[in-house]
Amino acid sequence: MKRMGMVIGIKPERIEEYKTTHAAVWPEVLAKISDCTIFLREPENLLFGYFEYHGQDWAADSAKMAADPKTQEWWAIHNPMQTPLASRNEGDWWAMAEEVFHTD
């Protein structure tokens, strides 16, 4: 298992809509993820996502998820609500964060 953190901006005028849609995530989207949490930081309007990856090949698994039509539909709704960080890696939407501490 690998812990993953990621950050993205959210447009302030879209925060309530983002919360509403995430209160009822589609089953087809939920079937592709587990152990996932998204936090909102205001007034900076940042989303911090945390999830646990349980696979062996992150690149292949994330490409498979990205190819899923329902996931693409979900992203098409939510991407306009978000503001990617300029410092993100090329090709990424969310900026991945480095884990610097963990304890059980």
Describe each model-derived feature in a short phrase:
Residues 1, 102-104:
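Basic/polar N-terminal segments that are highly enriched at the extreme N-terminus
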Residues 30-48, 52-56:
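Short, glycine- and small/hydrophobic-rich beta-strand elements in well-ordered beta-sheets
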Residues 92-101:
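Eukaryote-biased recognition of C-terminal alpha-helical segments
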Residues 1-3, 44:
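A general secondary-structure signal for short beta-strands and their flanking turns/coil
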Residues 6, 18, 22, 49:
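Hydrophobic pocket/interface hotspot
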Residues 14-35:
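Short amphipathic alpha-helical segments
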Residues 3-9:
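Active-site-flanking beta-strand signature of metal-NTP-handling nucleotidyl enzymes
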Residues 32, 54-93:
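An amphipathic, aromatic/His-enriched active-site/gating alpha helix that lines ligand/cofactor pockets
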